[in-house]
Structure formats: structure tokens, C-alpha cells
Amino acid sequence: MLNSNEKAYEYYRMINPIEHAKTREEAKKYKVEPYVISADIYGQGNLAGRGGWTWYTGSGSWMIVAGLKYILGLEIKDGYLSMNPHIPGFWKEYEIKYKYGEIIYNIQVARKKGQSTSFNSEVEMYCNNQRIEQNKIRLENNGKIYNINVIIQ
């Protein structure tokens, strides 16, 4: 997935169980729970499309990490919130509402008008309209609401 936003998103969707059970026919073919990560999906023969080996410990949590950190770009580390999005080219913007203790972070991420996104795109981060150096904010449980704007250059 490194160096390709589109590939990362494609692979994420490929293993996302809901993508295999959007219709009644797909769910009948998939045959496993549409809310649990499947370890494998048959690709050939009359079992093609069927899921197998569900309920692996940890796979759901890694799916969340992959989506939040490596695609949406949200990272919480050492008491800081940072954003480093790697979204596919057809996404123009998205929002995340993140709650930390009594704090609410309303995060809006948008591509600079006319910009495409490469894997190494630079971002600018603003908190309540103030530019944030190093694109990270210290998490403090002060009960405030913060409006974060992230602009993909």
C-alpha cells in the first residue's frame, strides 16, 4: 500500500466485509457475517466470493487502524493529535468528529482547489483558524471544542 493512495483504498475496500454483502445475492454468496473481517475470500470455482475463517482476534482492530491512520490520516501518539491523510484522488473532502475525554475535535479535511493527491502530499493544519506548526495538537482534557481544518496541498 505504500506510495499509492488509490491502491490502499482499493485494498481496504477489498477486505471490508460490508463490500461483499451489499445485496441479498452478495450476502448469500459471501455466507459469513458481514460485520466481521474474513481471513480469506474464495476466488475460484463454485465457491468464488465466499468468505471464510471469521472472528480472528485483532483483525477488526487492524482494519480500524488501517482506515483511520493510513487512509484518513488521524493519529494519536504521545499525547498529540496529528493528521497525515492519504486519500484516493476522487475524494474531495471528509470530516471526522473525535472525542478525547471532554474535548471535541471537529476535523474537516479538504483538498486544495484543483489539487490532486499524491502519497507525499503536504498538508496545512489550522485549529480555530490559527496555523498549527508541525501539524499536531496537544491533547488536553479542558472541555473545549476545537475546529480543525486540514488542507491537502
Regions found by a protein language model. Name each.
Residues 1-153:
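Non-catalytic C-terminal accessory modules of carbohydrate-active enzymes
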